[in-house]
């Protein structure tokens, strides 16, 4: 019996990052964590900055960082349209730590013209990248 899979396309503003059949996709939507598999009901959701984990047809996993975007689920396909997509192995941990430090420092020394929402978005993106790095480290340690 053939495995139940769905066509997944992950696309950034710059290029197509992944296209293929997958057993499942896990991503953080605007209302929380989503697990998408073959036969999922149609859905349209904003994506929060965070991790996308896919399980391929052969059972192997791949992890991506998404800075935000849109998820569309149709009966036979799933599309992720993301602002920025990075494979977990390509994330620069030191750069993410520095971005987190800068965002926290900026928030701590905020002036009258401070844009709190923009600072929170930058902090959330840096923290999401670091969570992806930590997840990969934990999986490697197993």
Curated annotation (Swiss-Prot):
Q: What does this protein do?
A: Produces ATP from ADP in the presence of a proton gradient across the membrane.
One family name in Pfam for this protein: ATP-synt_DE
Q: Which family does it belong to?
A: Belongs to the ATPase epsilon chain family.
UniProt subunit comment: F-type ATPases have 2 components, CF(1) - the catalytic core - and CF(0) - the membrane proton channel. CF(1) has five subunits: alpha(3), beta(3), gamma(1), delta(1), epsilon(1). CF(0) has three main subunits: a, b and c.
Q: Which UniProt keywords apply?
A: ATP synthesis, Cell inner membrane, Cell membrane, CF(1), Hydrogen ion transport, Ion transport, Membrane, Transport
Keyword ATP-binding belongs to the record: no
A GO CC annotation recorded here is: proton-transporting ATP synthase complex
The organism's taxonomic lineage, starting at the top: Bacteria, Pseudomonadati, Pseudomonadota, Gammaproteobacteria, Alteromonadales
Q: What is this protein called?
A: ATP synthase epsilon chain
Compartment annotation: Cell inner membrane
